[in-house]
């Protein structure tokens, strides 16, 4: 448990560093490098190559020399691996300017609703795929409300259309 907590605490420090440094005028590569260095500074290593990008729509994109811009969102996906190989892995998206635009906030609230629904639905005996598809239906309904999707929700989810918004699926398998 202590090793898991250590990995989580270091991962938390990595993310807060990204939020502090991820301001307009700084490059993605600079922030990504500093974030990775946090793991080393605590005697750990990164659990996978740090992802830090304004292009969160590109799954697993590497930090580039792109300069962070006001009004954009930055995605940070990082984690630490302890000497005994326990890992953390968290993804956070935050506004480079420090404040969400109205549309960004609306979408952030949808993600928050999906997160909360997943927590509420996840119980012993409930299948992962049942939770996954329930969240996908909520997500697709909310995207329709925001004018970002249209059509019958059940049919869209059955056809995989929700993956435009959730390409990775709901979490990682353990």
What kind of region is each of these model predictions?
Residues 1-174:
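Active-site neighborhoods and metal-handling regions in enzymes and metal-associated proteins
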């Amino acid at each position: 448990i202590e090793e898991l907590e250590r990995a989580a605490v270091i991962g938390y420090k990595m993310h807060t560093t990204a939020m502090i440094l991820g301001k307009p005028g700084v490059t993605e590569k600079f922030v990504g490098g500093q974030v990775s260095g946090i793991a080393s500074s605590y005697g750990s290593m990164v659990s996978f190559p740090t992802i830090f990008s304004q292009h969160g729509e590109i799954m697993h994109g590497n930090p580039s020399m792109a300069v962070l811009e006001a009004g954009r969102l930055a995605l940070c996906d990082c984690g630490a691996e302890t000497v005994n190989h326990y890992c953390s892995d968290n993804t956070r998206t935050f506004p480079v300017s420090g404040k969400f635009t109205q549309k960004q906030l609306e979408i952030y609230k949808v993600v928050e609703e999906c997160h909360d629904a997943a927590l509420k639905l996840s119980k012993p005996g409930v299948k992962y795929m049942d939770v996954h598809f329930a969240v996908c239906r909520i997500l697709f309904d909310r995207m329709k409300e925001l004018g970002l999707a249209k059509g019958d929700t059940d049919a869209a989810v059955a056809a995989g259309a929700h993956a435009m918004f959730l390409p990775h699926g709901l979490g990682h398998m353990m």
